[in-house]
């Protein structure tokens, strides 16, 4: 199983490390600094890094042999980015996604905006899940467990 993580702040890196320890392949994209993403990859904090959201979506939805699984297996994308970057990131990400894909938002976004995003994404067949735990260190394990035990088994083949 693999997913894409957008934003590589310390909380994102810790979540990624936890998921990697549990057998999940985590590809990272930094909205700020590709070199920093490469350093995190070299340290083993992420499974790989990409230079754009487009490449992240392609990587998460490929089988490693160059074949895309778009429409067959949902792509799962976690966002852990500052509130001012959310709108631009989603404007770029959503058109790249397909029905059945999942966005998990760990940002500090306003709840009303998140409710609007959930409605908009649901019309496209995309699941938008607002977790709203940005900055809470105890949430790292909880969110990873939610993903690994709830979302992954019901949405992803083993």
Specify the residue positions occupied by each region the protein language model found.
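Short beta-strand element of Class I
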Residues: 26
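Rossmann-like NAD(P)-binding element
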Residues: 31-34, 41-64, 70-113, 144-148
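Rossmann-fold dinucleotide-binding core
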Residues: 3-8, 13, 87-91, 110-158
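Gly/Ala-rich phosphate-binding loop of Rossmann-like dinucleotide-binding domains
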Residues: 16, 20
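Short coil/turn segments
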Residues: 8, 21, 29
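A short, structure-level motif marking secondary-structure boundaries and short turns
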Residues: 1-2, 21-22, 101-104
């Amino acid at each position: 199983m693999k997913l894409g993580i957008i934003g590589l702040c310390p909380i994102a890196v810790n979540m990624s490390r936890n998921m990697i320890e549990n057998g999940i392949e985590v590809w990272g994209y930094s909205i700020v600094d590709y070199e920093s993403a490469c350093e995190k990859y070299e340290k083993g904090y992420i499974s790989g890094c990409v230079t754009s959201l487009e490449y992240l979506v392609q990587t998460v939805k490929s089988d490693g042999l160059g074949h895309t699984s778009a429409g067959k297996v949902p792509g799962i994308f976690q966002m852990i980015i500052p509130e001012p970057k959310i709108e631009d990131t989603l404007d770029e990400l959503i058109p790249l996604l397909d029905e059945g894909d999942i966005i998990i938002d760990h940002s500090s976004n306003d709840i009303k905006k998140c409710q609007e995003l959930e409605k908009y994404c649901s019309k496209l067949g995309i699941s938008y899940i607002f977790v709203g735990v940005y900055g809470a260190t105890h949430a790292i394990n909880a969110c990873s467990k939610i993903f690994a035990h709830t979302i992954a088994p019901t949405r992803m083949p083993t």
